[in-house]
Amino acid sequence: MIVPIRCFTCGKPLGHLYITFKHRVLAGEHPGRVLDELGVHRYCCRRTLIAHVEWIDDLLVYEKRS
């Protein structure tokens, strides 16, 4: 999937936070602490960022056949 721009439940803009969140978690920081520091406190918004899986690179490998 493509990075979520807004929370699916409440509509809060999240797209600008995703790259920072991803880099910090991959660097070894605790996801909950990163979200707290980014100001993401609602459960619905936290779920949107934590549960997101990037599949777009895997899907682009397949060709469309006519």
UniProtKB/Swiss-Prot annotation:
Predominant place of localization: cytoplasm
Pfam families: RNA_pol_N
Function summary: DNA-dependent RNA polymerase (RNAP) catalyzes the transcription of DNA into RNA using the four ribonucleoside triphosphates as substrates.
Alphabetized PANTHER family for the sequence: DNA-DIRECTED RNA POLYMERASES I, II, AND III SUBUNIT RPABC5 (PTHR23431:SF3), DNA-DIRECTED RNA POLYMERASES I, II, AND III SUBUNIT RPABC5 FAMILY MEMBER (PTHR23431)
Keyword entries, A-Z: Cytoplasm, DNA-directed RNA polymerase, Metal-binding, Nucleotidyltransferase, Transcription, Transferase, Zinc
Subcellular location field: Cytoplasm
Cofactor, how bound (note): Binds 1 zinc ion.
Protein name listed in UniProt: DNA-directed RNA polymerase subunit Rpo10
Catalysed reactions, as listed in the record: RNA(n) + a ribonucleoside 5'-triphosphate = RNA(n+1) + diphosphate
Cofactor(s) required for function per UniProt: Zn(2+)
Homology family: Belongs to the archaeal Rpo10/eukaryotic RPB10 RNA polymerase subunit family.
PROSITE patterns for the chain: RNA_POL_N_8KD
EC number from the UniProt entry: 2.7.7.6
Assembly: Part of the RNA polymerase complex.
